[in-house]
């Protein structure tokens, strides 16, 4: 179920403060965040965010196409290395 329109998009307060501070200071350094649940707003376009995926920080550069999505959608948490059985079958043949 999607979020109600009357509530508006969710973004953590500390992340919005960091974004506005970087915007007024013309700072080009990446903004480090653990807030994967925050929605990407138009004010965030042009900035790079280091989004934590549970192990490392993944750099995400925000463009117009990212608006409306969550930050966590661009920092995958799982890595698929393949099924063990299929590799052994190829070697055995």
UniProtKB/Swiss-Prot annotation:
Note whether Transit peptide occurs among the keywords: no
- Cellular component terms, GO, for this chain's entry? cytoplasm; small ribosomal subunit
Which BP terms does GO give this entry? ribosomal small subunit assembly; translation
Question: TM spans, by residue?
Answer: none
Functionally, this protein is described as follows: Protein S19 forms a complex with S13 that binds strongly to the 16S ribosomal RNA.
What family does this chain come from, according to its entry?
Belongs to the universal ribosomal protein uS19 family.
Protein name per UniProt: Small ribosomal subunit protein uS19
Protein's gene: rpsS
